[in-house]
Amino acid sequence: VKLGIPHIFDVQLGYTFQRSHYDEPEVWSDNVEAVRRMFRTPDHYAYFTASANITRKFKASLFGNYTGEMLVQHNAGYIDADRSELTPSFWDLGLKLSYNFQLTNTIGLEINGGVKNFLDSYQDDIDRGAFRDSVYIFGPMMPRTFFLGLKFTL
């Protein structure tokens, strides 16, 4: 869905609901009961972007993704035995502010800055050490990250 008032405000959003299952239960470990639910496939996913032109030269944008709970495999090593884990749902939100300067009739400069993953959504049970499960990773890949940028336009 995309809504807005041209040159003032716009918002775009989407939502996906799905149930992903195998026809027959999948066995992935001798220690874990077979399941039909597909791993790493959340039932709920959503995204949005919203932008507002505060003034003719100043713009603010808010953007984000929502990922629902999902089942992931957690292999033994750091933990005592293989197990299936149900992850928490999480939001990954960002904010960007930008200001535009017209340097000449044909050259523009945008200065921007913001923060990605400002809620600092991050997996809090990452395995560590030599026996960690290197594929037991879910959620945003980056912690809270600040950024600055310049953009020239012709």
Regions found by a protein language model. Name each.
Residues 4, 14, 60, 64, ...:
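Small side chains
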